[in-house]
Amino acid sequence: PKTILPSIWRFKAMQPKIDMLIADPLKRADRRFLSLVNGDTPKDNPGALPGIFLGIQAFKSGEHILPHRHNSFAIYHIMQGTGYSIVEGERITWERGDTFVCPAWAMHEHFNDGTELAIQYFVQDMVGRAYERNLMWEEPVGHFGHMVKGGFRPHNPELGD
């Protein structure tokens, strides 16, 4: 197996891409996010580490990411902003520095009720699930998807490398 070396993604370097990201309008349950990929991970299993996805999600004041769910867990760390998430009916109020988890297949949605951009870092096991061909999601509610072929594309192709 290939050796996976440590990686760092500097916020200063990502800031211009986050600025481009927030110019992209939200559609349906869509989200604006950047994928942080370690170049040492295999091309057919790209992620921060094998099987682990690391991303940055940004949404503007007043925006709402519609209810959705997936069979990968999600750990969210709030880097900026204030708001709340509804996870399986439970309201989780968050602000800068907070961390919360969303279990696999838990219905969840996010709200930015603050006055500034909300930035969430999130970790998921979706890369491993996609590699195993068992990644599933439901978004918007009632519309199922299933990852049957490998490969990942950036949310906005202009943000990709």
Model-inferred region functions:
Residues 1-18:
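Non-heme Fe(II)/2-oxoglutarate
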